[in-house]
Amino acid sequence: MFIDTHTHLDGEEFAADRAEVMARAREAGVGKVFLPAIDIKSTEAILDVCRQYPGYAYPMVGLHPEEVRADWREVLVQMKQYLKPENHFIAIGEVGLDYYWSREFEQEQLDAFEEQVKWSVETRLPLMIHCRKGQNEMVQLLRRYKNDLPGGVFHCFTGNEHEAEELLQFDRFVLGIGGVLTFKKSHLPEVLPAVVPLDRIVIETDSPYMAPVPMRGQRNESAYVKFVLQRLAEAYGVSDDAVAEATNAAAKRIFPLAFAE
């Protein structure tokens, strides 16, 4: 059994066959799926999916950096209203910084991220962090809260050894590793074993995006997280079971509420 710690199974891409996708995930050995939000609409959709799959699908709440606009304050006021015990959120996410396409809302992204970092400190819910082209700014911000944060995941890590070491200085955090690991030109099979202990990794799909080899180019789904697990085992020179055990333990450490029942 292993866990897909980051999957957008609430998306419209799965509207026609979500039940089959869930069944294939279980069949592949996926014991739980964790669903990050990106905005208010997706938060509603995620809660619906998680109510349909209790004990299997677990929700997060957060405003994705690419969804941050000038009205971010009003949006976060509305989103925070969802942070009630009956919604059983396991994390604040997916939140962070994304300057890949544009820095138009650079300051707004930083401010919205910091506000949601404060939610994490207040609620003791871990962070699911999305960061593209903004690691320096992210690290600078997180350092101010390092001693107060409960922990979290640096989702979709694709960086180099130096970047990995910098992130691992946040000792309650782990790296989320997905389909990029399996790509032909990926440097992760060398980078990760060099500097990242296996117990500092969780596995993810980011479905419906970033499908791993041999499914690259297709719609990604949670069942395919097994290909990430297998490639990690090859890279570290250990068994698939050893990777499952280590990444499950990391997931349990970071997301205790998903294992509370």
Outline where the language-model segments fall.
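Mid-domain alpha/beta scaffold segments of enzyme catalytic cores
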Residues: M1-E261
